[in-house]
Amino acid sequence: MPKRSFTKDDIRKFAEEENVRYLRLQFTDILGTIKNVEVPVSQLEKVLDNEMMFDGSSIEGFVRIEESDMYLHPDLDTWVIFPWTAGQGKVARLICDVFKTDGTPFEGDPRANLKRVLRRMEDMGFTDFNLGPEPEFFLFKLDEKGEPTLELNDDGGYFDLAPTDLGENCRRDIVLELEDMGFDIEASHHEVAPGQHEIDFKYADAVTACDNIQTFKLVVKTIARKHNLHATFMPKPLFGVNGSGMHFNVSLFKGKENAFFDPEGDLQLTDTAYQFTAGVLKNARGFTAVCNPIVNSYKRLVPGYEAPCYIAWSGKNRSPLVRVPTSRGLSTRIEVRSVDPAANPYMALAAILEAGLDGIENKLEVPEPVNQNIYEMNREEREAVGIQDLPSTLYTALKAMRENKSIKNALGNHIYNQFINSKSIEWDYYRTQVSEWEREQYIKQY
């Protein structure tokens, strides 16, 4: 979605010309869940004057009940009309930043926090941080009550097409709706697992790209429902098949120059690119809980299913955590492959950016690239070349997060503490559950 710039008068004009009936004021909590306050268009002036208040104590990770009043400040450049509402009273959307009653940005707002880390980047002499995400999702059938089943909508595979790819029509409608909303779609295709799909859209600046991810998730789920399907961004909904990732392709710029590209450098990469990569590798264990934030995330990060389990980098193969795709010039980028679509994109990107800036600031040296298939290396071989494992559970990821300074800098005290508290509760709840697998394995044997 290209960057746009709208004024209050533009918004008034759009609302009148398009006969908009409702305004959806959207923001995101620390768990990555989209929240919104919907108001009739008669409240437009109040919205434009930043006077829309909501109860922050009702939102995960925000504030206590005694300090609950929050204000929504709309980003006018995010104005869009949901195409599927045209026949029932048009609904327009504005993404908002969350402010406190004293007029300052709320430190628990993930979007505002990402902007804070971007200001640190600018203080270091960089102008832009771009992100191209690759979100994947599964489509499941609904039952007669409209509830999701565990029955996939097809048994297709990588790049399959109809009649094997039964999700093709749904995916095509998703693309059409996204394009109507201003997305620049680069490709859409069936993924490796049955019922799994990927739609790639053009990179954008950090905040816009994260806004786009949240919009994308909403559109995918909405249009899937119209096809009597349930779209899920759960990383590993089924055993024995590939999980869903959301690879982050990132690049730093100084003005119009890609700070990662050097035509004369080794692999045509700059020292900045190598230092950024070194920072990502150094802090990877610390930011894993944010990039892979739910118990189920770690069912994806296992050998054999094309997801990274090991902390290494390569310019060639796809088994390490970090890959440098072959494109150069302005397209030079670093791909962080561990991120999954359950992640809060604002927090995940802030974590990766802060990790990379740590590498640049401290002039960290990147280890040698690993160009062989790490999945085929045994533990002794991996240890011999200094390859560490990513955390294998949410518990170990939270432990690594507590021991890492970079991730605390990336999130700020409020989000950092609230996130760890929320996820620790989630882990404690999970570890007391008794699964069907346990009953099948043990109830007769013991």
Swiss-Prot record:
GO cellular component term, pick one: cytoplasm
SMART domains: Gln-synt_C (SM01230)
Enzyme class: ligase
UniProt cross-references to InterPro entries, sorted A to Z: Gln_synt_N, Gln_synt_N_sf, Gln_synth/guanido_kin_cat_dom, Gln_synth_cat_dom, Gln_synth_gly_rich_site, Gln_synth_I, Gln_synth_N_conserv_site
SUPFAM superfamilies named among the record's database cross-references: Glutamine synthetase, N-terminal domain, Glutamine synthetase/guanido kinase
Catalytic activity: L-glutamate + NH4(+) + ATP = L-glutamine + ADP + phosphate + H(+)
Residue span, GS beta-grasp domain: 18-103
The enzyme's E.C. designation: 6.3.1.2
Site residues by UniProt (Important for inhibition by glutamine): R64
GO biological process: glutamine biosynthetic process
Subunit structure: Oligomer of 12 subunits arranged in the form of two hexagons. In its feedback-inhibited form, interacts with TnrA in order to block its DNA-binding activity.
Described purpose of this protein according to its UniProt entry: Glutamine synthetase (GS) is an unusual multitasking protein that functions as an enzyme, a transcription coregulator, and a chaperone in ammonium assimilation and in the regulation of genes involved in nitrogen metabolism. It catalyzes the ATP-dependent biosynthesis of glutamine from glutamate and ammonia. Feedback-inhibited GlnA also interacts with and regulates the activity of the transcriptional regulator TnrA. During nitrogen limitation, TnrA is in its DNA-binding active state and turns on the transcription of genes required for nitrogen assimilation.
Family in the record: Belongs to the glutamine synthetase family.
PANTHER family linked: GAMMA-GLUTAMYLPUTRESCINE SYNTHETASE, TYPE-1 GLUTAMINE SYNTHETASE 2
Protein name: Glutamine synthetase
Organism of origin: Staphylococcus epidermidis (strain ATCC 35984 / DSM 28319 / BCRC 17069 / CCUG 31568 / BM 3577 / RP62A)
UniProt lineage: Bacteria, Bacillati, Bacillota, Bacilli, Bacillales
